[in-house]
Amino acid sequence: MKYCLNRAGRLLLAVLFILGEAAAAYATPNVIKVGRDHYRGTWLEVGRTPMFLTDGCVAGYSSYRQGKSPDEILIEDGCSVDTPQGRLKTVRGTGTIQDFGTTNAKMQVRYPWLITFNYWVLYKSPDKSWFISANPSMTNLWIYSRNVPSKNKLHRMINKASELGYDVRKLEFPQQ
């Protein structure tokens, strides 16, 4: 996503993310095993923890495709500004599966401006149509789906996030 931050602001933001991840004392969440096909195609972001980077973003998505090596994933994250018909904002990153060949559930993504996020897959639905990921400290959580979910399905997703130990009152559900 294209942001208007000066160089010092970007550096400060990157340092805060790194320090926040390193300094947090937390119980490491359990991950599940996912196949390599998990990192193919487009997932819709139907729920997320609010953060500065996604302010004003609706109709969010993440598109994955294979990188140069088996453990590398090329990522495009995007959203529309303010309404689903709004201006498209995108950012590209390069992901590395940190536990390649075992669970394939821990991915570190490097974005521009030295911003790095860790995404761990905590749950994937039996029909593989949606999943929940979080950072290792469980301070940020995302719910993704291949399609816009019904209200009932969204409630199941939220309940699952709660079962995993996340305070779902912190989640926001942007317009699709």
Language-model features: locations:
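Bacterial N-terminal signal peptides that target proteins for export
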Residues: 2-12
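A beta-rich soluble binding module of mature secreted/lumenal proteins
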Residues: 22-176
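Bacterial N-terminal signal peptides
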Residues: 11-21
